[in-house]
């Protein structure tokens, strides 16, 4: 991903057939902000005619905004808020349209489960599909799905090298090389990254990672194309678990205050190998097949700051003691996935059909070991000691092995009645079987529980929508869809990282549905796309504590989100590009258990109002300027008493680029240029401040 960086670019023209192939292979990487097509083969229609809110962050947009992580990219999407890391999960933890989506990460249409912080070095776009989508993706997707579209080999020559240097000791080098091979229709592509940075205005936290992603394509421009790819991302970072909550709000201390130990760590290693086959039998019949093996390894020792005792708003802050709650663990996840999709276009009389049907299989496993530290020295709220880790002992609290087998089949038909009306109907059948073995221990090592659980969930989900196109440039739609959340959705029955309880183990899946009424328009000769949608998402049987069986949950709750989304992307004029939007989310715990007092309150980590925009101007000779803003409303980290809330905030960014020549460009990105203190990632036990004012300088060279 080309954030601010030194770029070395070479493009050479080849034969006419190769030029045609370039157009085919790069339709998703428009040189602006208006992406017209999804990378997902399950969608047969352009985004303009797809009856769902889909926000695509183009490579160009992420480049202009200087995004260096997937979280940087997701902050540009209204309706998304970020959660902080916890004991059993680190990495990307977004909430989409009111519901947590950390298990709804996909890479090129296949599940990307790993608990790791994703880097966009090998991505050409990030697609956010909003609303329940189990008919397309299987389990999960209550609020939506995030799909990462990888860079693919092309028929042209590309040579790029990025070097970024900036605030907080940021040094980032990434490269993109694409080379057509002597065999006609073949090409090799290689993407690399090495990234080191601390967190601006946060002492202690830092990130170190590298990544490599080679890919080989055979048959570019032919009826049959085979693509082999591999991606490795390895990190060794010091985690940031932020500040403690004090009297219901983030601790009143300088934002750089760090409560962790100087040798805390999170180490992750993601290895993803993929084989993809695309074959066109003719213009109306296409086969897409993928086979993937992925392994995700993780080890960590993290420190969470917790207030010792009862602290009120009247407690002198200089007397507050902080307990360092230290968790340690390691895990390995393995995933073997296969997909086969068949796309067919045909007619029945005067009615046209675009049908996608397919099958999916997967074997997934997870083997975590979780420990806590006993006898950890405490510290003070105002002056935490920056020392190496020490403890009396490490105590294993849980070991688990989870193996899941899934099988799915689906069919989706877009039925076209003339040029004005389309009807989309689809269904998917999922078989999700989980085998779990777990051992739990108390804080002194005694066995607290040994479980062997086998559970099979069989679910059918549906999707239907009606689209009306009064003119070619505009569409109105009304859609309905469903999704489900099984108890082992995250490859574990451990539902509580505090007591390691298996409170959801014997429950049927949660059921979700969504209704969305929207409209999409292309204006200014197709340069700018405008979208608006009204929607309602209902989780009809949310998990709540079972009053009759302590330690277990019951499907007796209900959660709702009613909302509005407004989005635009593209160009106001040839020299003005814009991307932005607004989301209004009215979330509610509509029904809760008798042991809770949160009925009627908003859902966790949901801002009622979020807003984001970015404007880029290239009308000044040799100069390019960009500016943007982001607003996130108040959010709750806990909605039962005592309530924990983080205040609303604004953040402003800017970019300046100067073209010294056609071959040399200098660039600077400034993030949070007002140095706003805000809280970016929430958790019921801690809250992480956002980055302070920072600048990254870059040099771009092309020839």
Which role fits each region the language model picked out?
Residues 631-638, 657-703:
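C-terminal beta-signal and adjacent terminal beta-strands/loops
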Residues 121-124, 135-214, 220-224, 271, ...:
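Outer-membrane beta-barrel translocator/receptor signature
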Residues 536-538, 554-640, 674-677, 698:
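Gram-negative outer-membrane beta-barrel transporters
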Residues 217-221, 333, 352-354, 360-364, ...:
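Structural signature of Gram-negative outer-membrane beta-barrels, strongest in the C-terminal barrel
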Residues 275-295, 324-438:
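Face-selective signature of the C-terminal outer-membrane beta-barrel domain
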Residues 195-199, 212-219, 223-280, 295-333, ...:
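Acidic/polar loop-and-plug regions of large Gram-negative outer-membrane beta-barrel proteins
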Residues 19-157, 517:
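Acidic, small-polar-rich N-terminal luminal/periplasmic segments of exported/outer-membrane proteins
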Residues 278-292, 296-304, 477, 506-571, ...:
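Membrane-embedded beta-barrel scaffold of Gram-negative outer-membrane proteins
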């Amino acid at each position: 991903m080309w954030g601010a960086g030194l770029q070395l670019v070479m493009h050479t023209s080849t034969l006419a057939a190769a030029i045609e192939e370039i157009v085919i292979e790069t339709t998703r990487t428009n040189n602006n902000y208006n992406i017209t097509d999804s990378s997902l083969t399950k969608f047969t229609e352009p985004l303009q005619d797809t009856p769902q809110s889909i926000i695509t962050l183009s490579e160009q947009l992420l480049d202009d905004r200087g995004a260096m992580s997937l979280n940087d990219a997701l902050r540009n999407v209204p309706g998304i808020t970020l959660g902080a890391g916890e004991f059993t999960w680190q990495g990307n933890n977004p909430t989409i349209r009111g519901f947590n989506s950390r298990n709804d990460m996909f890479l090129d249409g296949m599940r990307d489960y790993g608990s790791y912080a994703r880097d966009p070095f090998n991505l050409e776009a990030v697609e956010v599909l909003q609303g329940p989508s189990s008919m397309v993706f299987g389990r999960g997707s209550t609020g939506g799905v995030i799909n990462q579209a990888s860079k693919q080999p092309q028929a042209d020559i590309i040579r790029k090298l990025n070097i970024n240097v900036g605030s907080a000791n940021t040094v980032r080098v990434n490269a993109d090389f694409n080379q057509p091979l002597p065999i006609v229709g073949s090409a090799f592509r290689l993407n690399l990254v090495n990234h080191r940075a601390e967190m601006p205005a946060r002492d202690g936290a830092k990130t170190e990672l590298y990544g490599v992603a080679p890919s080989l394509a055979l048959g570019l421009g032919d009826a049959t194309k085979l693509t082999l790819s591999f991606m490795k991302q390895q990190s060794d970072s010091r985690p940031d678990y932020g500040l403690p909550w004090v009297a219901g709000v983030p601790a009143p201390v300088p934002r750089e205050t760090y409560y962790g130990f100087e040798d805390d760590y999170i180490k992750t290693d993601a290895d993803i190998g993929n084989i993809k086959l695309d074959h066109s039998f003719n213009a109306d019949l296409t086969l897409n097949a993928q086979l993937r093996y992925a392994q995700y390894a993780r080890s960590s020792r993290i420190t969470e700051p917790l207030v010792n005792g009862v602290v009120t708003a009247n407690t002198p802050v200089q007397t507050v003691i902080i307990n360092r709650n230290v968790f340690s663990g390691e895990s390995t996840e393995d995933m073997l996935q296969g997909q086969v999709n068949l796309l067919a276009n045909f007619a029945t009389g005067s009615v046209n059909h675009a049908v996608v049907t397919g099958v999916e299989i997967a074997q997934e496993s997870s083997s975590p070991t979780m420990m806590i530290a006993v006898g950890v020295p405490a510290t003070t709220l105002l002056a935490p000691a920056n020392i190496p880790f020490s403890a009396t002992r490490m105590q294993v609290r849980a070991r688990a092995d989870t193996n899941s087998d899934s099988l799915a089949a689906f069919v989706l038909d877009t039925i076209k009645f003339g040029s004005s009306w389309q009807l989309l109907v689809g269904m998917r059948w999922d078989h999700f079987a989980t085998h779990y073995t777990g051992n739990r221990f108390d804080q002194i090592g005694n066995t607290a529980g040994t479980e062997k659980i086998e559970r099979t969930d069989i679910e059918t989900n549906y999707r239907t929508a009606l689209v009306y196109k009064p003119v070619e440039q505009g569409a109105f739609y009304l859609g309905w869809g469903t999704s489900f959340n099984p108890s082992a959705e995250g490859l574990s029955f451990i539902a509580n990282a505090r007591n390691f309880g298996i409170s959801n183990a014997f429950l049927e899946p949660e059921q979700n549905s969504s209704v969305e009424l929207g409209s999409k328009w292309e204006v200014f000769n197709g340069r700018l796309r405008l979208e608006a949608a009204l929607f309602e998402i209902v989780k009809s049987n949310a998990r709540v504590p079972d009053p009759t069986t302590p330690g277990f949950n019951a499907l007796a709750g209900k959660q709702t989100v009613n909302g509005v989304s407004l989005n635009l992307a593209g160009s106001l004029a040839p020299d003005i590009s814009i991307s932005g939007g607004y989301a209004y989310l009215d979330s509610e715990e509509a029904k809760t258990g008798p042991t809770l007092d949160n009925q009627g309150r908003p859902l966790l980590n949901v801002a009622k109002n979020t807003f984001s925009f970015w404007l880029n101007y290239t009308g000044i000779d040799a100069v390019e300027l960009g500016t943007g803003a982001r607003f996130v409303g108040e959010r709750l980290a806990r909605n039962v008493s005592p309530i924990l809330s983080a205040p609303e905030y604004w953040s402003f960014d800017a970019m300046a680029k100067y073209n010294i020549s056609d071959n040399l460009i200098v660039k600077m990105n400034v993030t949070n240029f007002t140095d706003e203190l805000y809280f970016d990632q929430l958790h019921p036990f801690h809250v992480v401040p956002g980055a302070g004012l920072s600048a990254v300088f870059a040099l771009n060279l092309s020839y």
